[in-house]
Amino acid sequence: MTVSQQPLEPTPFGLHRVQAKTTSLEGILPLLTYHGGLIVEGLVSQDILQDIEKELRPHFQQGWNTDPMFSQKTRVVCGLPGKSPTLINECFGHPLFTEVCDALITSHSSSRFGEQRYDFRSPPVLGNTVAFSTLPGNAVQRMHRDDMDHHNMLPAIASDQYEAGRDCVVTLLVAGTRTTKENGATRFIPGSHLQETLHIPDESQAVYIEMQPGDAFILLGSTFHAGSGNVTDEEERILYSVAGVKSILRQTENIYYTLPLEKVREYSPWMQKRLGFSASSPLGGHIDLKDPREVLGLPEPSDIQWFY
């Protein structure tokens, strides 16, 4: 499906902002699919941010020590479904982000079982979670695309050729603190999602994603981006990252080994399914040809269409 409402006239790629209180899916999709990312101001309230920090602050203990993914001045926390239910429910589960993921990375297909035709729909699941605390002296990160874990090799296209399903990942970056060029704000290259996968990133085209606490940046998995150096004397930059992925692909983070079943039960049935504790239509992720929700004793079966 080609994404509609592209700009009527060719416009330069750049960084755009919308207001969470006044925008909608229809307002976001044209900008997101044209530029590759955009800022949603005020997506998360200050009260929710405080709750998230209370849940995650104790886990920020030591810097990254495995080169070259992050700087040693970056403290990284993963496995966030088991550490911050507030982040998962309020950010990953935010209605606006859910709508964006559903529109762009829901998997659709049709097949035959004998003469009978079946149409399958599989909504996205949580793919990855990371909380970042970057301290003064943090080094510049190299440009990368979030979809590389999923072998998503893409050809170059024109902006009006973009179709839902081209990307397999959509990421949400939530500012836990003020983020500036000086304290390490993420850089991204607008329009890079339209380039072929092995195109060499051009840093001269990068822009800084400067945000206030509670602002969020939505980006497509094929968009080049990277963390920047923190050249301040004492500012800490905190950023929370959650990503949706096509449910027919392997999740980047192994959520099933990091989230005990008793904590799974604390989430709503809808969120349990978005975390991946559910079969994917038609039969992905079954246990002895049964819905995992049945085997695990979770409420509400998956919304799948069995074909046998």
From Swiss-Prot:
The name this protein goes by in its record: Dioxygenase peniF
Oligomeric state and partners? Answer: Homodimer.
Give the EC number(s) under which this enzyme is classified. 1.14.11.-
Q: Which organism is it from?
A: Penicillium patulum (Penicillium griseofulvum)
Knockout phenotype, as recorded, reads: Does not affect the biosynthesis of penifulvin A.
EC top class, as a word: oxidoreductase
Protein purpose: Dioxygenase; part of the gene cluster that mediates the biosynthesis of penifulvin A, a potent insecticidal sesquiterpene that features a [5.5.5.6]dioxafenestrane ring. The first step of the pathway is performed by the sesquiterpene cyclase peniA that generates the angular triquinane scaffold silphinene via cyclization of the linear farnesyl pyrophosphate (FPP). The cytochrome P450 monooxygenase peniB and the flavin-dependent monooxygenase peniC then catalyze a series of oxidation reactions to transform silphinene into penifulvin A.
Q: Which family does it belong to?
A: Belongs to the PhyH family.
Tell me the residue numbers annotated for binding Fe cation: H144, H225
The organism's place on the tree of life at top rank: Eukaryota
Coiled-coil boundaries: none
The cofactors named for this UniProt entry are: Fe cation
Q: What are the protein's UniProt keywords?
A: Dioxygenase, Iron, Metal-binding, Oxidoreductase
Question: Which SUPFAM superfamilies did the record assign?
Answer: Clavaminate synthase-like (SSF51197)
A single GO BP term for this record reads: biosynthetic process
Q: Kindly list the GO molecular function terms attached to this UniProt entry.
A: dioxygenase activity; metal ion binding
Show the taxonomic lineage: Eukaryota, Fungi, Dikarya, Ascomycota, Pezizomycotina
